[in-house]
A protein has these predicted regions:
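Short pocket-lining segment of the protein kinase catalytic domain that shapes the ATP-binding cleft
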Residues: 309
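N-terminal, intrinsically disordered, highly charged
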Residues: 1-304
């Protein structure tokens, strides 16, 4: 299965072709490949990405004894096969606020792609269908810069597409409400802070959704503490991971203030008091269902309250 140039006809990955290539390269036996095809034909969900299906079969990697053909290993293999760079998507290294405006959520979902970097020279797009090019010319024309392609894990592309665009929508919604109100105090009142301590749903406020994302993301990244720091132009959220602080998102200043107020409410702190340091505690659930208690501390600064969790 040779790599295709962008001028070649588009071709979706085919399970039969991929298994044949894995057999020819010594990763699988022919018997195992045929067994996989039989299972696939009888499967209810035939829409699963071929690499995800192969990985789900927990097959032994004959070229690396003792190792399974896991999804990430298969993604690296596919990138080499397509002669495109491989990328393991690290959300800590992606400027979500910069990449989400590059295309609509519908466009990203339709083509199963995700923008992962942008600079003055190019836009880097992750895809798990390296031989499909139909979206490239339209996107390059709209963005007025070349497209640099990378191959990434299809599961990660789907998960982070949903996560990044949901966060961007919440930030945009919260900021637009603030701009309509035109003042910080009314913005915080509108949020009805503390009114939704239950599990967030689609009807919750934008700020509640952002705070919920913040907790989930911190647990996913195994952050030891979270810093929310106001600035004149942009507030920032930073996670400490393995002793190093990483900036994970920058919010408009008014949104940063509202996030801090939401957290103060959850921690049973005095929302109205902004000139004195305060301490509080909040209990929340980890993604695996465990309960954890977070300590909250606020400190007044020239641009609002800084919070450390």
């Amino acid at each position: 299965m040779p790599a295709h140039a962008s001028s070649a006809p588009d071709r979706l990955l085919d399970l039969n072709d991929l298994l044949r290539e894995l057999v020819s390269q010594g990763y699988l036996t022919q018997a195992t490949a045929e067994q996989c095809l039989t299972i696939r034909r009888s499967a209810v969900n035939n829409q699963q990405h071929p690499l995800e299906f192969i990985a789900s079969q927990q097959l032994d990697d004959l070229r690396h004894p003792g190792r399974k053909l896991e999804l990430e290993h298969l993604t690296v293999w596919l990138a080499a096969l397509a002669n495109q760079p491989y990328l393991r998507i690290d959300p800590l290294k992606i400027d979500v606020a910069a990449v989400t405006p590059l295309m609509s959520y519908a466009f990203a979902q339709r083509h199963k792609i995700l923008a992962v970097a942008v600079d003055k020279d190019a836009v880097t797009i992750a895809s798990a269908q390296p031989f499909v090019h139909k979206w490239e010319s339209d996107l390059a024309h709209v963005l007025k810069r070349p497209i640099k392609r990378v191959v990434a894990n299809p599961g990660d592309i789907q998960r982070f597409t949903v996560e990044f665009f949901r966060l961007a929508k919440s930030v945009s919604g919260a900021n637009s409400i603030d701009q309509k109100l035109g003042n910080f105090g009314n913005f915080e009142q509108l949020l009805k802070l503390g009114a939704s301590d239950q599990e967030p749903d689609a009807n919750d406020s934008h700020i509640v959704n952002i705070v919920d994302w913040l907790f989930q993301y911190a647990f996913q990244q195994r952050a030891s503490d979270i810093h929310i720091e106001p600035r004149r132009e942009q507030g920032s959220v930073r996670f400490r991971i393995d002793g190093v602080l990483h900036t994970v998102y920058q919010f408009p200043p008014q949104v940063t203030m509202a996030i801090v107020s939401r957290l103060k409410s959850l921690g049973r702190m005095n929302i109205a008091e902004k000139r004195k340091p305060q301490d509080g505690r909040v209990k929340t659930k980890t993604p695996d269902g465990g309960e954890v208690e977070l300590r909250l501390s606020t400190l007044p600064t020239a641009f609002g309250e800084k919070m450390v969790m």
